[in-house]
Amino acid sequence: MCGIVGFVNYKQDVSRFRNILINMNNTLVRRGPDEDGYYIRKHIALAHKRLIVIDPEGGKQPMVESCSKSIPLQKENSDMVINYNSNFVISYNGQIYNTDELRKTLEENGFTFNGHCDTEILLKSYIFYGKNVVKHLNGIYAFAIWDSQKEELFMARDHFGVKPLFYTMQSNSFIFASEIKAIFQYPGVEKILDSQGISELFGIGPAHTPGTTIFNNIFELKPAHYAIFNRYGLHIEKYWSLKSLPHEENFNQTCEHLEYLLKDSITRQLVSDVPLCTFLSGGLY
């Protein structure tokens, strides 16, 4: 479990707000007691609290990757290309379970790697796939990636919302974090309870209307959604939904398929460079 925080403001130089970023990040120490990191430029501030699981030296965050590539100009009967140079910066909480498959695809397309952490694989997958990266991920995650050339922030949350991600707007600043208490460290963000959110908390809690919280003007990025924030504003889009399909396997095929999926899931989730353990509950016989 790690923690991420950050904010974007196109009308102010946020590099002056380092102490604000540090205060926000310090509220998440329980999520990442091993290490912290900061990335601050004119319009972007990113921070990370790390719980080390994989690649202690190679997985430091926020992680920066420089990229130069040529992009074909999307115009009929044109052979022109745009030379694109940018720094991509990621702050990420989670674990990607299909890193081997992603890494193989990236290496086949000319990417090289400095370590074996999933952070680097995720960041380079975004550089390769763009916003469609979420369609290629198997895992639990909440992450933010800054494109310095576009001056654009991309955020995404996993399919079922295992990893949390909250956001708000305050005085031209877009502010986000793994926990709401970090957002409250940003000057001017008020702790005003939302009557509908409180009603849901006592009436149907812990269930709630997706995207809402118990505080006014503080929202969660919904599961299976990504968000893009740039000078034009905030755009949020759903990238996946659970489909109901006819079940065509017989009993024995179903048992074999379920056993395979269960073992595959466990194997993928037991990747670690530090000692690990698990809690078991009843239900499987």
Stretch-by-stretch model annotation:
Residues 1-285:
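Cysteine-centered catalytic environments shared across enzyme families
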